Amino acid sequence: VTITDIAKASGVSKTTISRYLNGRFDLMSPETRRRIESVIDVSGYQPSTIARSLKNKRSLLLGIVVSDQSSPFSTAVLLGVGDALRNTEYVPVFVNCDDDPAKERYQISFLLSRGVDGLIVNTTSYENPFLVNLEARGVPVVLCDRYIKGHTFDIVTTDHDSTIRQLLAHLKEQGYGLPALFSQRWDNNSVRLQRRQAFAA
């Protein structure tokens, strides 16, 4: 079944079918939309993502890089990204780095070799010239949670400074005088650095 078959069965042009498949319902009447929808349901037609990506010169793949997939935080990121992309054309490609900067570079290079349209990265490194270079080359990169020293990427994160200060204030109100902070190494992790600095302030 092709787009031409759907157009003939619906009594409309291929342009109208293309508009329907691209969600441009504002360019057709409700009756036309229902008729096309019915024909597609009966025929079992599935548009070719590969053909569409070739036409638009996009892969419709989005690389999702997590630093440690065993972490509950990484699980939340993967679920959230999957939910956000569910009603879009994009297909997420997930990779794990095991908190290893060398593996992160390898995995990102792998994703780029597969032609992903962009990257969402929970980076392993506070100092990351590899990602900085990618952004300078025009690769769309959005950071998740951890930022990179000295560079302003688009980022989705938490206000860790404010969170720690609120936590300490709450503990003080509850009568706890000398709280302690236990952490993994923080020298190359922006989130841990922020928490430590807020704790020491």
Spell out what each predicted region is:
Residues 1-59:
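N-terminal helix-turn-helix DNA-binding module of bacterial transcription factors
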Residues 42, 83-88, 106, 112, ...:
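Bacterial carbohydrate/catabolite-sensing allosteric modules
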